[in-house]
Amino acid sequence: MDASTKTTKKGAGGRKGGGPRKKSVTRSIRAGLQFPVGRIGRYLKKGRYAQRVGTGAPVYLAAVLEYLAAEVLELAGNAARDNKKNRIIPRHLLLAVRNDEELGKLLAGVTIAHGGVLPNINPILLPKKTERANTGGKEPKTTKAGKSPKKA
């Protein structure tokens, strides 16, 4: 056979040329994930965590990472809304993580840059409630002499 009778096109990637190319379906799309399964698989192989990496491992890891990211972002978005802000900043991330029991335990040893600290006042330092109880539950009225109350 001479070169003129070949039907394969150059750059066809090892497949027979001619027809329209089928749209590629990534493993992330197959798994219904936003996180990149292929990239995570590459990192697992390149990192030499094990001699061999199964086909399901990067899918599972991508799903776990996506879930954790969604959880943290949801709580941080709520913290931003509580502070009347539209943009999530590191402070909101810190408040979200530290106020959630399970995430706080997971990220106990993690320092979030520019996150600040949780607001916390020791109960001993707070004013005592017994002062108010001695007056019968009512605050003493203080009126200034010479001033009449405002009329509506």
Swiss-Prot record:
<keyword id="KW-0238">DNA-binding</keyword>
<dbReference type="GO" id="GO:0000786">
    <property type="term" value="C:nucleosome"/>
</dbReference>
<dbReference type="InterPro" id="IPR009072">
    <property type="entry name" value="Histone-fold"/>
</dbReference>
<dbReference type="GO" id="GO:0005634">
    <property type="term" value="C:nucleus"/>
</dbReference>
<feature type="compositionally biased region" description="Basic residues">
    <location>
        <begin position="7"/>
        <end position="25"/>
    </location>
</feature>
<dbReference type="InterPro" id="IPR007125">
    <property type="entry name" value="Histone_H2A/H2B/H3"/>
</dbReference>
<dbReference type="GO" id="GO:0030527">
    <property type="term" value="F:structural constituent of chromatin"/>
</dbReference>
<dbReference type="InterPro" id="IPR032454">
    <property type="entry name" value="Histone_H2A_C"/>
</dbReference>
<comment type="subunit">
    <text>The nucleosome is a histone octamer containing two molecules each of H2A, H2B, H3 and H4 assembled in one H3-H4 heterotetramer and two H2A-H2B heterodimers. The octamer wraps approximately 147 bp of DNA.</text>
</comment>
<feature type="compositionally biased region" description="Basic and acidic residues">
    <location>
        <begin position="129"/>
        <end position="142"/>
    </location>
</feature>
<comment type="similarity">
    <text>Belongs to the histone H2A family.</text>
</comment>
<feature type="region of interest" description="Disordered">
    <location>
        <begin position="1"/>
        <end position="25"/>
    </location>
</feature>
<comment type="function">
    <text>Core component of nucleosome. Nucleosomes wrap and compact DNA into chromatin, limiting DNA accessibility to the cellular machineries which require DNA as a template. Histones thereby play a central role in transcription regulation, DNA repair, DNA replication and chromosomal stability. DNA accessibility is regulated via a complex set of post-translational modifications of histones, also called histone code, and nucleosome remodeling.</text>
</comment>
<keyword id="KW-0544">Nucleosome core</keyword>
<keyword id="KW-0158">Chromosome</keyword>
<dbReference type="GO" id="GO:0046982">
    <property type="term" value="F:protein heterodimerization activity"/>
</dbReference>
<protein>
    <recommendedName>
        <fullName>Probable histone H2A.3</fullName>
    </recommendedName>
</protein>
<dbReference type="Pfam" id="PF16211">
    <property type="entry name" value="Histone_H2A_C"/>
</dbReference>
<dbReference type="InterPro" id="IPR002119">
    <property type="entry name" value="Histone_H2A"/>
</dbReference>
<dbReference type="GO" id="GO:0003677">
    <property type="term" value="F:DNA binding"/>
</dbReference>
<feature type="short sequence motif" description="SPKK motif">
    <location>
        <begin position="148"/>
        <end position="151"/>
    </location>
</feature>
<dbReference type="InterPro" id="IPR032458">
    <property type="entry name" value="Histone_H2A_CS"/>
</dbReference>
<keyword id="KW-0539">Nucleus</keyword>
<dbReference type="Pfam" id="PF00125">
    <property type="entry name" value="Histone"/>
</dbReference>
<feature type="region of interest" description="Disordered">
    <location>
        <begin position="129"/>
        <end position="152"/>
    </location>
</feature>
